[in-house]
Amino acid sequence: MNSIFIDKNLLDFLWNIYETLYKIIKKAKNYRGKVVKKNKRLISFLGVFIMLFSFCFQGNVQADVNTVQSGKIKSGNVTVWEVGNVAKVLADVERLNLNTVNVPIQVDIPNVTSTNMVINQAQKQQAIILIQELLKRNIQVIVEPFPYIQQGNVGETEWNPSNINDFFWNWKTVILQDIFNSITSKYNVYGLKIASNFVNMEYAEGYWSDTIDFVRQQYKGNVLYQMNWWLTASFDSSYEAKFVEKINRPYLKKVDIVSIDSWFEVSGKRNPTYEEVKKSLFATTVYNRGQNVVQQLEQLHKATGKPVYFGGFNVPARELGLQNPWNPDVSNVFSKDVQLNGWRAYRDVLEPKPYFKGFSIWFIGSNDSTHAYQIHSKEAEAVINGWYRK
C-alpha cells in the first residue's frame, strides 16, 4: 500500500489556521440573538472547514510499514496521560519510521501493597480511540495494562501486593478480562503485555504459568512478559545467581516474546564517545561492574528460546545519560551527543542479532519538546529511522 504524507511545514501552517479558526468559532458561538444570526453563514463555513481539516489531518498520516523488515518491531511507548495526543503520536510514528505503538491501559492501584485494582475507564476510552486510529493506518498495536500506583506517584517496580493469591485473581479477572472484553476481542491487537516490571511478583512461577494459560484461552495474538532490567558485577557472584534465576523462570518459555524494560547502566562517563559506549555494552564501566549486557541478552534468549525485545528504551539527552538512563534528570547539562552515541552503539551491536526482536522508544506522543527523552537531534532521529529499514 502506498503511504501518503503531508509536508511538515504545510502541516504546521494548516494547523495554525485550524487553531485560529477554532478560536473564532468558539467566540462566535458565545454571542446571542442578532450577532449569531449575522454570523450564521460564517459559523457554518468554519464548522465545515474544521471537520474537513480534522479528517485530512489525521487521515493522511500513515506509517510506512513496508519499509520495516518483516518480523521486527519498531515501536514507541505512549504514556497513560498522553494517549489522547493522537496527531502527535502519528507524527512521531512517521518521523521515526515506526511500525508499532505500545498503548497503555491505566490500572489504578491505591498503594504499593494493595491487591485491589481497577481499570480507569475514561483513560481506556481514549486509548481505544488511539488504537482505532493506529489500526486504520496499518500500525501494529501492543496493549499494556499499566500500573498507576498512588495516582502515578509510585513506580510499578515498587508494587508488592500483601496477598499474592488475591493479586493474581484480580489481575486476571478484573484487569485482563476487561481488556479481553473491550479491546482484544474487538480489535486486531498484535501483542499483549501480561506483566510490566513486576519484580516482586516474578517469583510466583505457578501463578504466572496459570495466567498465561488464562490469556491463551481468550487472546490469539502475541503474549509478552516484560521484566525489569538487571545488574550484575564481576566482583559479586550473588548478582549473577539472581540473573540466572531470573532468566530460567519456566513460564518465560510459554510466552511469545520476552520483553525487557531496558535501562542498563552502561557508562559512567559524562560524555562517552560512540566507541566507548559500544565497548561498554560488553563490559559496563559504572562502578567497574564489568556487566556484559550483550552476552546476557543472548543468555536470556537461549534459556527461554524466545526473541528478546526492549519493551521500553531510550537514552536521555543529558550528561551521564548512560550511567542512569532510567533518570531523565540525571544531570541538568543537556547533551545531544550522549543520546546519539547511545542509540548508535545499541543499534550497531543489536541490529544484526537474529534473536533481537526490536525496541520501543520511551516515549512518543508528547508535546514537551524539552524533555530529556525526546529525540533531540536529526542525527539520532536518522539512526532510529534507519534501524530495521529494508
Regions found by a protein language model. Give the residues of each.
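Aromatic-rich peripheral "rim/lid" segments of glycoside hydrolase catalytic domains that contact
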Residues: 321-331, 336-345, 349-390
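Substrate-binding cleft and catalytic face of glycoside hydrolase catalytic domains
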Residues: 96-113, 126-201, 317-322, 362-367
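Aromatic-lined substrate-binding rim segments of carbohydrate-active enzymes
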Residues: 90, 103-150, 202-225, 281-288, ...
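Alpha-helical scaffolding within the catalytic cores
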Residues: 84-89, 174-180, 233-249, 293-297, ...
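Glycoside hydrolase catalytic-domain groove-lining segments
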Residues: 224, 248, 253-324
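Sec-dependent signal peptide cleavage junction
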Residues: 53-65
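Aromatic-lined carbohydrate-recognition surfaces of secreted/lumenal glycan-active proteins
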Residues: 144-146, 193-196, 203, 212-240, ...
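Boundary/entry segment of secreted carbohydrate-active catalytic domains
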Residues: 63-93
